[in-house]
From Swiss-Prot:
Signal peptide: none annotated. GO terms for cellular component: ethanolamine ammonia-lyase complex; ethanolamine degradation polyhedral organelle. It comes from the Bacteria. The basic unit is a heterodimer which dimerizes to form tetramers. The heterotetramers trimerize; 6 large subunits form a core ring with 6 small subunits projecting outwards. One of its GO terms (biological process) is ethanolamine catabolic process. Binds between the large and small subunits. Its EC number is 4.3.1.7. This is Ethanolamine ammonia-lyase small subunit. It comes from Pseudomonas aeruginosa (strain ATCC 15692 / DSM 22644 / CIP 104116 / JCM 14847 / LMG 12228 / 1C / PRS 101 / PAO1). It catalyses: ethanolamine = acetaldehyde + NH4(+).
Amino acid sequence: MNDKHLPDASAENPWLPLRQLTPARIALGRTGTSLPTRPQLDFQYAHAQARDAVHLPFDHAAISDGLRQRGRDSLLLHSAAADRHVYLQRPDLGRRLDEASVQRLREHAAGYDGQIDLAIVVADGLSALAVQRHTLPFLERLEEQALAEGWSLSPVVLVEQGRVAVADEIGELLRAKMSVILIGERPGLSSPDSLGLYFTWAPRVGLTDAYRNCISNVRLEGLSYGMAAHRLLYLMREACRRQLSGVNLKDEAEVQALDGEAPRTGNFLLARD
């Protein structure tokens, strides 16, 4: 075999400088026809982190304690999925509360006079790690702004083994105008702790994803807590004005100024004049 046709033993990728701009796995280089050892080990480590995030138990007590220190009440409920094994194999059960939780929430709602503007739900989802890292700092920013604007908020409802649609049942039982659920997103190989927010106007059992607005990738390396709260409050205002949410309600929140730039709206991917 002619040696000149063999690949270099180790070769860098010309895209290497782009790695400064993204955590995505690009420009990994090669050794012969394979990945170098370091990127291969990094991949295996990231995969292990993602698996751990899915199976990490939900430390709801820590979140409840943090809320209590800020003078906020919480309520612990459980979905109809009895454990993690059932939760992963039966998504439908994660979308509804178990009977004991339904009864407890009904009793709790009976003590309310008037209507709650926003029911706040926190569920472990597919990454309890995301919920435990980001719930308290995000809620601190959201609640400060929401209360300043005069919105009435429910106690924070914590749900074990919950999926997105469980917030519909909770919002309906609380007779809330709107609901938002903070939930751990499916872990990626570069983001095992990504938090998602799902917002719904007039929550009720049976709604599809078309009736929800999603704000995703809330974490330090993604969408900041402040910007996520800013976008959610915009959706709340517009939902109340237009009496709807989901595909008919677009997120056109004004992007806050950075480095002295004027605020702007629209798609940040489009070139600016």
